[in-house]
Amino acid sequence: MRQLTPDRRGVGRRLAARLAGLVAAAATSAAGFDLTQLTTQLARVKSGEATFTEKRRVEMLDRTLESSGRLAFRAPDTFIRETLKPRREKLEVTGNVLTMSLGERSRTLQLDSAPEAAVIVEAVRGTLTGNRESLERLFDANVSGSAERWSLDLVPRDLRLRGQVASVRVSGRDATVREVQVLLADGDRSTMTIEPLPGAAP
């Protein structure tokens, strides 16, 4: 049997080490997409506009309610949801200030005084703006998928809030949010499908 010379053995070891490194890097790339990478990707987009269609299943009424309208956000902390159908409503949040409008009437309050709304707003706003600190403070967060197609599962850390909103799942492609699913503790659930407006997507 032909014996490897010391030089050849050295080359073989270096080649094996490089191959092992490539395999490890590939495995890390495939399995390592996490919240830090996702929020970094999302934070590059500083503003956006989209249309939405939402279907909400209300168990008490045994029916599904549909609505549609427009969404907008501006980093670092502004989120606007304007419902156009079946009736005009507007929800605008900047920082901790929530303004709700219905027709010509409007009401302004602190976001944290409306816990159910706060959980949903913070889940969507925090994801849109790539605010990892806010998401980690308020939720147990789990990312699945890849940078090209991902899902972010959020469960409120506060047990009292979890008694109202069981979980939120935000899904998207690249740096664009495309769907938000909300499961309330009473069994009601909603799915909001989001379509970026031309020129608004990254």
Identify the residue ranges that each predicted region occupies.
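Hydrophobic h-region of N-terminal signal peptides that target proteins for export
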Residues: 21-32
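N-terminal mature ectodomain segment of secretory-pathway/periplasmic proteins
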Residues: 37, 43-95
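Short, solvent-exposed helix-to-loop capping segments enriched in aromatics
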Residues: 42, 119-134
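An acidic-aromatic
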Residues: 70-122, 190-191, 196
